[in-house]
Design a protein with these regions (language model features):
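Interfacial loop-to-helix junctions that mark the boundaries of transmembrane helices
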Residues: 1-8, 96-104, 180-191, 213-219, ...
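Small-residue-rich segments of transmembrane alpha-helices in multi-pass membrane proteins
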Residues: 39-50, 71-80, 199, 219-234, ...
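Membrane-embedded hairpin module used as a gating/binding unit in multi-pass transport
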Residues: 109-117, 121-207
Length: 340
């Protein structure tokens, strides 16, 4: 059995490195689209809750079970479920909610792996989308940079990678301290605080020049840690939970799945630009609205491997999905549990 702490540590490293890409210039470029994406994702979160509650009532299920099958397991994912399931079970005095909700979240993760990237391929072919950032890490430019350097490339690249890992350790240590001292009672994931610390560190470095963050080394490490996380999290999936789900719960899930796909295809894509970046954000948004943000990033990565990198699309999904939505979704769930 894989240690869940190892999975969480790898994911924290990956997200901290993604946040280190967040230079002020890149943040300014994606600010408006990030706010739009955040607003639309919140609308989808409310829609998921209403669908779960309505369907649960129609099928004779407990209304809080409907909420668990909606926003908590879909947009919230396993991290949010871990925080809120004990409260729901205590509130309603019923057991089995945790197993059902985790089963729905697991089924969502599996389905998101199957539908997100194919939807992206469909949009690319239908609208002949081109990636404007394809030359962002141009090989010819990299070769010229290597030729001009007076040190062997492997030596320079290794040193830069070690520097980035050290910066990540410092950011994670600071985030742990902040979480313990000031945010102990706040139900937000640890990685959210890590990402905020990394964003501050990157822009502090750009402003003061005290240290640098090498883009190529950062890209190399993010790819390595994303692959590691996908491998570990896939091996850790408890697929047996899916087979324990009752027919009404599966019916509610597939209703949620259809709504999520339609929302990503027609709302995210059409309102966020109808371009390559908009397609990437729609793919990431669909995947993280079905159980786990990392699924969205892995589906985006599979498309970027084929069509070229797009850093601002990745950064928008990371900042919105893992920082802004982690906070606003917690508040939304608390509000929904209060009124229903």
């Amino acid at each position: 059995v894989l240690n869940p702490d190892l999975n969480a540590l790898i994911f924290q490293f990956f997200l901290t490195m993604m946040a280190l890409m967040g230079s002020w210039k890149l943040i300014k470029t994606g600010f408006v689209i990030s706010i739009m994406f955040w607003s639309l994702a919140m609308v989808l979160g409310v829609l998921q809750a209403l669908i779960g509650l309505t369907a649960a009532q129609a099928l004779g299920l407990h209304q809080h079970l409907g909420l668990l099958m909606g926003t908590l397991s879909m947009m919230g994912g396993t991290e949010t479920l871990t925080n809120f399931i004990p409260a729901v079970e205590h509130l309603d005095k019923f057991s089995g909610a945790a197993q059902a909700a985790m089963g729905v979240a697991t089924l969502g993760m599996v389905c998101s792996m199957m539908v997100s990237a194919p939807m992206g391929e469909y949009l690319i072919k239908k609208y002949s989308l081109k990636n404007p950032s394809r030359s962002e890490f141009d090989n010819a430019r990299l070769i010229r940079s290597i030729e001009r350097s007076d040190k062997p490339f492997y030596q320079t690249h290794t040193i830069e990678c070690i520097k980035i890992i050290a910066i990540c350790f410092v950011c994670m240590a600071f985030s742990h301290l902040i979480k313990q001292k000031f945010l102990a009672d706040v139900l937000i994931p640890d990685y959210t605080v890590c990402m905020v610390c990394a964003l501050v560190a990157r822009n502090f470095a750009d402003t003061t020049g005290w240290f640098s963050v090498d883009g190529l080394a950062l890209r190399t490490l993010t790819k390595i840690f994303l692959i590691l996380f996908i491998l570990v999290s896939t091996c850790a999936l408890q697929l047996d939970l899916i087979f324990d789900l009752s027919a009404p719960i599966v019916a509610v899930f597939f209703l949620e799945l259809v709504v999520n796909v339609l929302f990503a295809r027609f709302v995210y894509f059409n309102l966020l630009g109808r371009d390559f970046r908009g397609m990437l954000i729609a793919v990431g948004g669909l995947a993280f609205s079905m159980g786990m943000a990392a699924n969205g990033l892995s589906n985006m990565q599979s498309l970027c491997e084929k069509y070229g990198p797009n850093t601002d699309g990745f950064l928008v999904v990371c900042v919105v999905g893992l920082i802004l939505l982690a906070i606003s979704n917690t508040l939304l769930i608390k509000f929904l549990l209060t009124i229903f």
